[in-house]
Amino acid sequence: MNLIALLEQEEIKRLTGDKPVTEFAPGDTVIVSVNVVEGTRKRVQAFEGVVIAKRNRGLNSAFIVRKISSGEAVERTFQLYSPQIASIEVKRRGDVRRAKLYYLRNRSGKSARIKEKLVSKQANHQAQG
């Protein structure tokens, strides 16, 4: 392993601390809690939407979340290991066949829906036991 990769790994470990990073994939509906500083106040703002892309590049990993807010589409890019992200919660798993869902930008309404991924009984049993 080269020196840069080693340093990136240490930095990821420092940024995540003891909390593991939530596993999610494109097509999943997630709620990203973001720390927002307004003057002297610090609050947590939730951004809920569909993950349309995920970029796995070590420390530079990022993902794009798309939501429809009062009829207008909003896309926001988040750095995965950013200190501004308080938490990432997966609300629903999506069943998609693509890694990048940019085609959703051209669709609206029912055509932009994503099927829910059904978990098999065997996988469910392993998770519980």
From Swiss-Prot:
GO terms classed as biological process: translation
Keyword Amino-acid biosynthesis appears in the UniProt entry: no
Cellular component aspect of the GO annotation: cytosolic large ribosomal subunit
Signal peptide segment: none
Keyword Ribosomal protein listed: yes
Listed PROSITE patterns: RIBOSOMAL_L19
One Pfam family linked to the record: Ribosomal_L19
Keywords noted in UniProt: Ribonucleoprotein, Ribosomal protein
GO-annotated molecular function: structural constituent of ribosome
Function according to Swiss-Prot or TrEMBL: This protein is located at the 30S-50S ribosomal subunit interface and may play a role in the structure and function of the aminoacyl-tRNA binding site.
Family indicated by similarity: Belongs to the bacterial ribosomal protein bL19 family.
Name assigned to this protein: Large ribosomal subunit protein bL19
UniProt organism field: Bordetella avium (strain 197N)
